[in-house]
């Protein structure tokens, strides 16, 4: 079963908000701390509390540092070694955390015009940021490794003072991390931090999630209190009702230059490949040109094979498909006796009652040819032999 985690950075995203949202979904703080205990960084603990922002209640998390711990400027190689040597981190969590730090390092290197090996992390190299990023990787592990999707994050505006001095918001590293993905330029102050941006870039697909059934909702509350929005990250965890290729689908394409011979061939091919039904509808297309709409009703497992036939063997440049639902009568076959021989009849039933009945045409044709009578006469006799509908 596919699991989905959908993140909505209503008031932005930071590393501590990601962890807090995971805890609000039900993750045990003690279990999270155990997984992070192998990090060889001194003087930290998790402080978990309830908080409210704009009438939304959620979990707030602080990484509380030992007062004696300085904030060293760690190099990328130092952080990589810390993560690799943490024997309590699950292997997949290590891979994710390393990927997030590498993304941050590459963004910082691009901004400063140096090699990643020459980068020394300042705020992101501090103990709390290391715990945030490794903790986010552990959160996904404890949630069962769901697919992560996220809404476009708001970036904020203004300026902020960091180790390098005053910087515009979003800071250069944040914007570099979120190149080529949808974002929102709105809000006042720093709504999305470099750590939050890196978590989204590496761990999530930014855009609309697939339709899914929401089972749990958690709110990670940040440290800020914005006037225009709650500083919360909403996390919805659930499951897909069905895989995207299940159920019934209609595959269709518009054709403006298909010959009758080609249309007939396409219908035969679609049915041969596994379409439940296939048909052609006359349509009027752009510039008032007559054309044809080629359609096929298919089960999800054969959808891609049907799409392949349409693209390979028709003249279309594209294919559409959409999910459909249907109600069908139960069906069975009975054999009836006519004055000229036996004929099969297909019946449609609902709750045991016969609603429709259709003699098998090929049976009727063969009997009619052998007896020298019209086919319609055999068909009428077959229906009469079936008796009244029950």
Curated annotation (Swiss-Prot):
<dbReference type="GO" id="GO:0016151">
    <property type="term" value="F:nickel cation binding"/>
</dbReference>
<comment type="similarity">
    <text>Belongs to the LarC family.</text>
</comment>
<keyword id="KW-0533">Nickel</keyword>
<dbReference type="InterPro" id="IPR002822">
    <property type="entry name" value="Ni_insertion"/>
</dbReference>
<protein>
    <recommendedName>
        <fullName>Putative nickel insertion protein</fullName>
    </recommendedName>
</protein>
<dbReference type="Pfam" id="PF01969">
    <property type="entry name" value="Ni_insertion"/>
</dbReference>
<dbReference type="GO" id="GO:0016829">
    <property type="term" value="F:lyase activity"/>
</dbReference>
